[in-house]
UniProtKB/Swiss-Prot annotation:
Name of encoding gene: tusC
GO cellular component entries: cytoplasm
Annotated organism of origin: Vibrio vulnificus (strain CMCP6)
Record Pfam families: DsrE
Protein name in UniProt: Protein TusC homolog
UniProt keyword Cytoplasm present: yes
Keyword field contains Cell cycle: no
Length: 118
């Protein structure tokens, strides 16, 4: 079975790509079991707990990440270097993730048959 990987690289709420990525990911999970999700660069902010979106008049879609368990999305990776550069740890995130180094991240991306970037 081919591996489908969703790559989140952008900060939330600056444009709609994060929300669109989550929507696409949850929809694809109904048809594909081999899904990985990777958060790198500013994409790690997508998972940041405690986001307050009311003041910027944006819908808070961060709780949708908590649906990953319900949709059997088990392979969720966050770049260790990206977290460190932003002064974050896995405890700052909404959901449990596997924090991986650059070499491990390259392996995940290399094993992907399809890569969708948001």
């Amino acid at each position: 079975m081919s591996q489908l990987t969703y790559l989140f690289r952008t900060a939330p709420h600056s444009h709609s790509s994060g929300r669109e990525g989550v929507d696409a990911l949850l929809a694809a999970s109904a048809y594909c079991e081999a899904i990985s999700v990777v958060f790198i660069g500013d994409g790690v902010y997508q998972l940041l707990a405690g986001q307050q979106t009311a003041s910027i008049l944006c819908k808070d879609y961060a709780p949708m990440f908590k649906l990953f368990d319900l949709y059997d999305i088990e392979h969720v990776y966050v770049c260790q270097q990206s977290l460190q550069q932003r002064g974050l740890t896995s405890e700052d995130l909404l959901i449990e993730v596997e924090v991986v180094d650059t070499a491990q991240l390259q392996g995940v991306l290399h094993n992907s048959a399809q890569l969708l970037s948001f």
